[in-house]
Amino acid sequence: MARSFYSHIKEAWKQPGDGKLAELQWQRKQEWRDQGAIVRIDRPTRLDKARELGYKAKQGVIIARVAVRKGGARKKRFTSGRRSKRQGVNRLGRRTSIQRIAEERAARKYPNLRTLASYWVGEDGSQKWHEIILIDPEHAAIENDDDLNWICDDTHKGRAFRGLTNAGRSNRGLQNRGKGAEHTRPSAGSGSRRGK
């Protein structure tokens, strides 16, 4: 049976460090390091993943690549007024994933657009790159698109900040079901002091 073009792309991205994709990624990262933290791009790097998440090559749909530095939370030592237990600086993790941070930064950069979803495209020793799919809710092409016009409704404002994107829902634990997920819905803080 003949395989689709997208299946070949997906297969290559399962191991981006091997084969022809590895050399291509090596060249890309050299260019990406010289660019800014948030860059608008013409077309997605991973076409299969972008299409899977709702991307369409049409007006009103924008892709931005965002670089976020790796590692735990950067925290400064307090100058006064903490007991030793609360003075922690090192070994503190983030409460949000790097992917979610990337979505929020893109949403702040483009306040008139709405975040649809995002996906990983690469990383090196010091940073990770994600591509964010952004939608213009005022564009006529989006308002007339039956697959995307739901995002034009005002209830979808600030999706990235409210944890409603794919990275946000994953970060909130909403992909887990059954035992151990009793306190994740509707949110980790609702009804109990226990979180995820």
Curated annotation (Swiss-Prot):
Annotated coiled-coil positions are none
Q: Which GO terms describe its molecular function?
A: RNA binding; structural constituent of ribosome
Read off the InterPro entries from this record: Rbsml_eL15_core_dom_sf, Ribosomal_eL15, Ribosomal_eL15_arc, Ribosomal_eL15_CS, Ribosomal_uL23/eL15/eS24_sf
* Keyword terms, alphabetized: Ribonucleoprotein, Ribosomal protein
Q: Where is this region: Disordered?
A: 162-196
Q: Which GO terms describe its cellular component?
A: cytosolic large ribosomal subunit
Which top-level group of life is the source organism from? Archaea
PANTHER family (UniProt xref): LARGE RIBOSOMAL SUBUNIT PROTEIN EL15 (PTHR11847:SF4), RIBOSOMAL PROTEIN L15 (PTHR11847)
Q: Which family does it belong to?
A: Belongs to the eukaryotic ribosomal protein eL15 family.
What is the protein's name according to its record?
Answer: Large ribosomal subunit protein eL15
Query: Gene for this protein?
Result: rpl15e
